[in-house]
Amino acid sequence: MYTTYIATTPERLWQALTEPAFTERYWGVAFESDWTTGAPLVWKQGGARMSDPEQVVLVSDPYRQLAYTWHTFTEQWARAVDIAEEVRAELAVERRSTVTFDLEPQGRQVKLTVTQDFDPEGILHGMCSQGWPPILSSLKTLLETGEPLPAN
């Protein structure tokens, strides 16, 4: 679980979580979805396009909560983000995780809590525990300054 406080509105934070132009700036991922519960979710990252019937929006409560299933670990994705095939194959057999974003207004800021339910012993846990802190820091910086953190 990761929590950060962002000087923004719930509406602006929701926009940053759901609009491809935003997500691409701080995350390097663009999403295609109509963001209704049950809607498909397509990930675009590094030239790869990931789509799967199990890749869906689970909860869509605008300005309060967003949850969806994590992307499918395709060979195309692994090549696009430079993940070895052996690692991709191990990721592909882990149970599909979900990620939940809880937005809670607190005065002139929003408390954002991100929870991802994965196997704590799995490879994905290690990868995401290194990935979420810089993603959320860049999101916060983008919303507060207009520019994301520089990419590594």
Region roles according to the model:
Residues 13, 23, 41, 57, ...:
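Hydrophobic pocket/interface hotspot
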